Amino acid sequence: MKKGKILIVAAHPDDEILGCGGTILKLKEKNDINVIFMTNGVSARGKNKISEKRRKNACLKLFRYLDIPKPEFFNFPDNQLDKTPLLKIIKKIEKKINLYKPDTIFTHYSNCLNIDHRKTFEAVNTACRPINKISVKKILSFEIPSSTDWALFHGKNFQPNYYVDISKFLNEKINL
């Protein structure tokens, strides 16, 4: 992958590491990387503000370790992106794209079991439609096996057609 600006759009904190953590480790040396999270990842589990703060602090600590800019949290309700107007989600993503001007976006696979993953994919693809001059040249999906492997009735299984060799970073990714 050529040097450029990468935007990772993930539904929840930790999706970016599970889905493309090794790729982040490899590409951060020669690329600018920004990450946005659509939700806090805890509110649907009946967790309280302490759990949310703990998860956010762990996320920020990881980003300091990775030496990439702090992520942006959009704070939509967890596991409820299907109840949020799609246009509202799209406009937040479009604003980030217009400010950051990424060349490449990594996001969820379209047929994940998790509704937030599917809606994130849909919003990213809609935000990148070619109606205006847009910076995004490539949209790549990542897999989160716990979500894609259980999506039996949501269409095709994840079938990657783009690979990043992360063999030099595999042990570090596992330890993230």
Per-range role (PLM):
Residues F37-M38, F73-P77:
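Short glycine-rich catalytic loops that host catalytic nucleophiles or stabilize transition states
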Residues L18-I36:
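Histidine-anchored nucleotide/phosphate-binding helix
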Residues I17-L18, I115:
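Short N-terminal helix/helix-N-cap motif within the alpha/beta-hydrolase-1
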Residues M1-V9, K26-E29, K47-K53, K61-Y65, ...:
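Metal-dependent de-N-acetylase/amidase catalytic core
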Residues I8-I17:
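Short, glycine-rich nucleotide/cofactor-binding loops
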Residues A11, M38-N40, I144:
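Cofactor-binding loop segments of dinucleotide-utilizing enzymes, especially the Rossmann-like FAD-
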